[in-house]
């Protein structure tokens, strides 16, 4: 698994794990970052824009580094 912040623009992945302080983990899970959720990097920068469940969400890259994803090339 790799941090979500390392995905390239247009690349997709599936959430595998969310790390960090319990409040951050809870907030991200409420937004849909649960195991198996499909995510897409739409824009890198400040903020990063992520596609998740038909929505576009903006995050600091530091927060996205705590979301670990599986990318298709890694799925085996």
Positions of the model-derived regions?
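C-terminal structural segments of small proteins and small subunits
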Residues: 4, 10, 42, 46-76
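Short, basic/aromatic beta-hairpin or loop at an interaction surface
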Residues: 6-20
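Short alpha-helix capping/helix-loop boundary micro-motifs
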Residues: 23-27
């Amino acid at each position: 698994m790799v941090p979500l912040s390392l995905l390239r623009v247009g690349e997709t992945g599936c959430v595998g794990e969310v790390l960090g302080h319990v409040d951050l983990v809870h907030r991200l899970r409420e937004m849909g970052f649960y195991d198996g959720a499909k995510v897409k990097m739409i824009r890198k920068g400040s903020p990063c824009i992520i596609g998740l469940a038909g929505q576009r969400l903006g995050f600091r890259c530091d927060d996205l580094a705590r979301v670990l994803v599986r990318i298709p090339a890694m799925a085996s």
